[in-house]
Each structure stands twice: as structure tokens, then as C-alpha cells.
Amino acid sequence: MSRIGKKPVQVPAGVTASVDGQKVTAKGPKGELFFVANDEVSVKLENNAVVVQPLNESKDARAKWGMSRTMVENIFKGVKDGYERKLEINGVGYRASMQGKNLQLALGFSHDVVYQTPEGITIAVPKPTEIVVSGINKQQVGQVAAEIREYRGPEPYKGKGVKYAGERIVRKEGKKK
């Protein structure tokens, strides 16, 4: 039984929510997002809270119940506060800079990697070894951060590469003579 799905999602102050069938729309200070729930769950707006219920007792419906509730909570947090993901760059000569709206990365290749910033995402470079990805859509922020990290993920011997802030790299020992 889903414990997550049972709790109604309170609409935060400063956010207006509307439910139209399976579509939940949220407008807030950061922007507007919507989520279309699966057909196996029902979504209602009651007493300034969104209530998600499964339509039947199937295992599939129960799985989508908790997921739908979490997605609604994510769009509320996104339009109110937004999401951000920090990346760190380790390595000699590895650095990042902004070239207009594009992110330019020097990661030890023969050429610089240029990453085009998608619509709805803001990328900032406070230091040459730090990248901050922010936006209102949690999935999109995580996807962009993962794409940037993928160019040169951290390697286990020296820890060089792009990693998430706070990520722990499991280090390996080098060859012994």
C-alpha cells in the first residue's frame, strides 16, 4: 500500500493550482508547470490541497498513485522555489565558462566542448571549477546536469572530471611495482 500517495499535497502560499480532468496546472512566482496524471489515478482539488487516489487496486495503479502525487508536489516546489544542481570540475586545466547562453567546457580534449543551454534552464558559472544548473522543472534540471557530467565523468584513479557537488568518488589504487 502506498504511504506516499495517501498524503494530500498542500498548495503552497503564492501558488495557484487548478485541476482539469487528469491535468494539474500550477502557477507561481517562478513560472507555470503542468502534469498530466495517468488514467489509473484520479486527481481532485479539495480544501486547497490536491488529492490523488487510485481508481482500482491493481499493482500498476498503486505504483502510479505514489508517483503521481510526488510529481504534483514537484511542480508546486518548482514554480515556488525552483530547483538547482551544482557540479564541480576537478583536474589540471579543466574549467568552465559561459559564452553567451552556451556553456564552454575545457575538459582535456583537443577541442572545447560547447553545451547549448535548453529553453527553461539557467546555467551559471560562479567559479571556473563550479557550474550551477537551475530551473523550475526538476526532471529537466537533473537531465541537463547529467548531460554535462557525461562529457567527462569522474575517473576513479585521480578523481579528475565533472562530478555533482557532494558526490563521493570511490577511488582505486594504482598499479604497484
Curated annotation (Swiss-Prot):
Gene3D superfamilies in alphabetical order: Ribosomal protein L6, alpha-beta domain
Superkingdom as given in the UniProt entry: Bacteria
Family (UniProt): Belongs to the universal ribosomal protein uL6 family.
Protein's UniProt keywords contain RNA-binding: yes
A single GO BP: cytoplasmic translation
HAMAP family recorded: Ribosomal_uL6_B
This protein's encoding gene: rplF
Physiological role: This protein binds to the 23S rRNA, and is important in its secondary structure. It is located near the subunit interface in the base of the L7/L12 stalk, and near the tRNA binding site of the peptidyltransferase center.
Transmembrane segments: none
Keywords (A to Z) from UniProt: Ribonucleoprotein, Ribosomal protein, RNA-binding, rRNA-binding
Protein's organism: Sinorhizobium fredii (strain NBRC 101917 / NGR234)
Matches recorded under Pfam families: Ribosomal_L6
Protein's name in the database: Large ribosomal subunit protein uL6
One MF annotation (Gene Ontology) recorded for this entry: structural constituent of ribosome
NCBIfam families: L6_bact (TIGR03654)
A GO CC term attached to the entry: cytosolic large ribosomal subunit
Subunit structure, interactors included: Part of the 50S ribosomal subunit.
